[in-house]
Amino acid sequence: MNQTNLLTTIPLRYQFPVRLLHLFAIIALASVTVTNAQPRSSQKRLTPAEPRPVSAPKRVAKTKPLTAANQRAAEKRLADLGYWTGRVDGRWDEASRQALIAFQKVERLKPTGQLTRADFEKLIAANRPSPLETGEAHIEVDLVRQALFIVDGGGVVTNILPVSSGSGKEFKSQGWARDAVTHPGRYRVREKLSGWKKSPLGELYYPVYFMYGTAIHGHPSVPTRPASHGCVRIPMFAAKRFNRMIPVGMPVIVHDGNPPPPIPTITGH
């Protein structure tokens, strides 16, 4: 039975609502057909994002802390290599710190005065430094490494101290402008004085003069960089003994890593 015959069997007063419902059904069906007929390319497909790989945290090797036994071994090793530690008694004091600074300077490490595990291992494996020159017993002042070496007649470095030489800056003294320079050259110890010596530029402790107005002397401040007016500063704890062990006339070689020229021979007419 088709739809027309079906409507004829329905009383007339019910046919209009039925036709209206039939029309709504046709419209709804058409809208669904149009929606489904849209091209698939207009519909975006959501692709789940791939998870980023998470790297495992890097493990940092822990540095083994130094023990009291390590400090005693470091102090003894410094003394064995010629660094001026004072009395080797296992106490890490100012003399020990200055000896370590001298070692760090000579080995071209950062002169912090702090004993690290890395510096301790380098110290244990280090050798006694070699002098710039051999022959007659003498003093060497290395302006580059800011260190002083006492060398015996056999060419062995017996003692090493950290120093601070001329800063290179200009200063005024007694109305004159001067440069704070420690000049490289070959000198000899001219004079030694005990105790404190007053000068226009300050006080010098147990000075050992090797050039007019220029001395190796103790000073409360010995920075790891050049900072003096031209003298060679050494730590206070070593100044008195240094003064007494160095004879007048001993050669002093001040250098910048290269041997300075020999002292010219002056002949009479």
Predicted feature descriptions by range:
Residues 62-71, 76-98, 102-122:
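Short acidic, glycine/serine/threonine-rich helix-capping segments at coil-helix boundaries
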Residues 64-71, 89-97, 112-113, 141-144, ...:
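Solvent-exposed, acidic/flexible segments
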Residues 37-67, 77, 262-269:
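Compositionally biased, proline/threonine/alanine/serine-rich low-complexity intrinsically disordered stretches
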Residues 101-180:
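Cell wall/extracellular polymer interaction/catalysis modules
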Residues 38, 58, 132-134, 181-184, ...:
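Exported/periplasmic cell-wall-interacting domains
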Residues 78-88, 103-111, 127, 152, ...:
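Sec/Tat-exported extracytoplasmic proteins
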Residues 2-38:
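Sec-dependent N-terminal signal peptides
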Residues 71-75, 97-101, 120, 124, ...:
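Extracytoplasmic/secreted envelope proteins and their assembly/folding machinery
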